A protein has these predicted regions:
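Glycine/tryptophan-enriched, flexible segments
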Residues: 533, 549, 553-559, 565
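Glycine-rich ThDP/TPP pyrophosphate-binding loop and its adjacent helix/strand module
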Residues: 351, 365-371, 380-396, 401-527
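Alpha-helix capping and helix-loop boundary segments enriched in small/acidic/polar residues
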Residues: 96-99, 135, 146-153, 207, ...
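Residues within alpha-helical segments
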Residues: 3-6, 10, 442, 465, ...
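Short acidic DE-rich linear segments
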Residues: 582-583
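Conserved active-site loop/cleft motifs that coordinate metal ions or position small ligands
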Residues: 476-478, 545-547, 556-557
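Ferredoxin-type iron-sulfur electron-transfer modules and their immediate structural context
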Residues: 2-152, 159-244, 248-369, 421, ...
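Short conserved micro-motifs at the rims of enzyme active sites and ligand-binding pockets
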Residues: 158, 257-258, 488-490, 556-558
Length: 583
């Protein structure tokens, strides 16, 4: 078929008549759209740099254009101005079939589909043609699903997971050209205020509730159907307003900040993830350094707050604010509110110490320190640093997007690659089993460890992430992430389905090890259906290609792969017994 396609390219040439007048046409240049709406820093960056670079005219920029960015930083949220319009088909919402589950938003790799909760007044001001429903569980509110067609990549993950009603989905895929005029509906949705009572009703750390929080990772350049970005996006919805991210070089750094476009953004208060990238293998140490720097600054501020609280000149209001901040010093969930109260109480006071505290208010609240990277970094070239950070005992979170291969560099084998998988440096199928990074981390006894696979268990994913962040020590999350390098025969629109199959067949296991919990180890996966194991392997080109090239070797390695999966699950069930019998 491939040869026939090549031959058709030569024999199927069609002559296109070009008008004679084109010979004398003048070059009118590109039609640049001048951006005016948004934060001044990002608007200036988009107009002066991003637009030119995206048009491949970056070489024409003078050095003076970069004077505001000499420290290497760039404004958050510039990806929202690209509006690439690259999808062939985009999701269309049929409100009659919607059960308001928010699954579509939860799995969207690019944050282009979002639920909106509107008051009656907001709904009355909605653009013409905006469909909406009475909101379930929230009388007086209207509910809508909004879609940014111009930012969509057309992967279809949302439509794939949509449960719909009576076999009829609420989301179907249709031609982009027929829905480009609906962009104002999405744009309106971004102006609607975030409803604290709605988030409180459905809870921010649940599948449904989390999606009423603005994603602070939006419109990245990740592949259509990417398995990594849904995890990162969810983390920003849970903790993005107080996040620091150290990002290892790899896919997550490329979709995380491909110059000049920055998909990490801010909320209505101007708060969002502070992101940086370490070029080499020292990302864990890099993130650890961020944490130590924060701790040093906050410890100094803590001493000054204690001095203010102990002062005889301090009012009762000031003392109460200081006490609340000190009491919540180590709680990320509570310290932010206490910080706002402290700053409000100290502002305007003519006191050098108070002025110093207010001047450094950005450092007062406890931050959520994350270290992002892929398996090539965490299992291989950066493993020493990962181990060092986990051993430190410090309150820090490591998120590993586990694609079981070096994704960004083209699919090289890593220590996460499983037996029989074909990858660069393992063209004949990898002969050795996957490194058990989770067990290595659990051996410390004081590290929170979780394995998650979003498509297999939406609730377990958000629960594990919330538990890891709340745990007052090091945490490690290994997230199964389907990748284009896997060659999923069903296509990347079925990435969430593949995550589900991986767990159902025992290829991947979901579990949580929480040293702070009474029940330390929880195996969240049911007993696998091993009958479908070989079909799962053959459903991905990384395995199926070996079966085509060398069936005998494939049969041997695939059998070994399956045996290792059985052994792995049996080991996990023993951990359930071991920790379940603790006094």
């Amino acid at each position: 078929k491939n040869w026939a396609a090549i031959d058709a390219g030569a024999t199927g040439v069609v002559k296109v008549e070009v008008p004679e007048s084109w010979k004398n046409c003048e070059d009118e240049g590109l039609d640049y759209k001048v951006v005016t709406d948004g934060r001044k820093d990002v608007v200036d960056f988009v107009n002066n740099i991003q637009t030119k670079v995206s048009a491949q005219e970056g070489n024409s920029l003078p050095v003076s254009a970069f004077k505001d960015y000499v420290d290497g930083s760039t404004p958050s949220g510039s990806a929202a101005y690209e509006k690439r319009g690259i999808a062939v088909n985009v999701p269309v919402w049929n409100s009659d079939n919607c059960i308001q589950c928010n699954f579509c938003s939860y799995v969207c790799p690019h944050a282009v589909i979002r639920p909106v909760a509107m008051t009656a007044e907001e709904a009355a001001n909605a653009p013409a043609g905006m469909k909406m429903l009475d909101m379930t569980g929230m009388p007086g509110y209207k509910f809508a699903i909004t879609i940014s067609a111009l930012d969509c990549t057309g992967c279809g993950s949302c439509a794939n997971v949509c449960p719909g009603k009576k076999g009829e989905k609420a989301l179907t895929m249709d031609k982009l050209a027929d829905h480009m005029d609906e962009q104002p509906i999405f744009d309106f949705g971004t102006t609607v205020s975030e409803k604290e009572d709605v988030v409180a009703k459905f809870k921010a750390n649940t599948v449904k509730g989390s999606q009423f929080k603005k994603p602070l990772l939006e419109f990245s350049g990740a592949c259509a159907g990417c398995g990594e970005t849904p995890y990162a996006k969810l983390i920003t919805q849970l903790f993005g307003d107080r996040m620091y991210i150290a990002n290892a070089t790899g896919c997550s750094s490329i979709w995380g900040n491909s110059s000049p476009s920055t998909p990490y953004t801010v909320n209505a208060k101007g708060q969002g993830p502070a992101w940086d990238n370490s070029l080499f293998e020292d990302n864990a140490e890099f993130g650890y350094g961020m944490l130590l720097a924060q701790n040093a600054i906050r410890d100094e501020l803590k001493e000054k707050v204690e001095n203010v609280a102990a002062s005889e000149e301090a009012s009762e209001e000031v003392k109460a604010a200081c006490a609340e901040w000190l009491d919540t010093f180590g709680s990320g969930a509570l310290n932010g509110v206490a910080t706002d109260k402290l700053v409000a109480a100290l502002e305007g006071i003519d006191c050098p110490t108070c002025k110093y505290i207010v001047a450094n208010k950005a450092f007062l609240a406890k931050k959520s320190q994350w270290i992002f990277g892929g398996d090539g970094w965490a299992y291989d070239i950066g493993f020493g640093g990962v181990d060092h950070v986990l051993a430190s005992g410090k309150d820090i979170n490591i998120m590993v997007f586990d694609t079981e291969v070096y994704s960004n560099t083209g699919g090289q084998s890593s220590k996460s690659t499983k037996t029989g998988a074909v990858a660069q440096f393992a063209a004949g199928g990898k002969e050795t089993k996957k490194k058990d990074l989770a067990s290595i981390a659990m051996s410390y006894g004081y590290v929170y460890v979780a394995q998650i696979s979003m498509g297999a268990d939406y609730a377990q994913t958000v629960k594990a992430i919330a538990e890891a962040e709340a745990y007052p020590g090091p945490s490690l999350i290994l997230a199964y992430a389907p990748c284009i390098n896997h060659g999923i025969k069903k296509g990347m629109s079925k990435a969430q389905t593949e995550e589900k199959l991986a767990v159902e067949t025992g290829y991947w296991n979901n579990f949580r090890f929480n040293p702070a919990a009474e029940k330390k180890f929880t195996l969240d996966s049911k007993a696998p259906n091993m009958e479908g194991y070989q079909d799962f392997l053959k459903g991905e080109v990384r395995y199926a290609s070996l079966a085509m090239k060398n069936p005998e070797r494939a049969a041997k390695l695939f059998a070994k792969n399956e045996a290792e999966a059985k052994e792995r699950y049996e080991y996990l069930t023993k951990l359930v017994t071991l920790y379940g019998n603790e006094e």
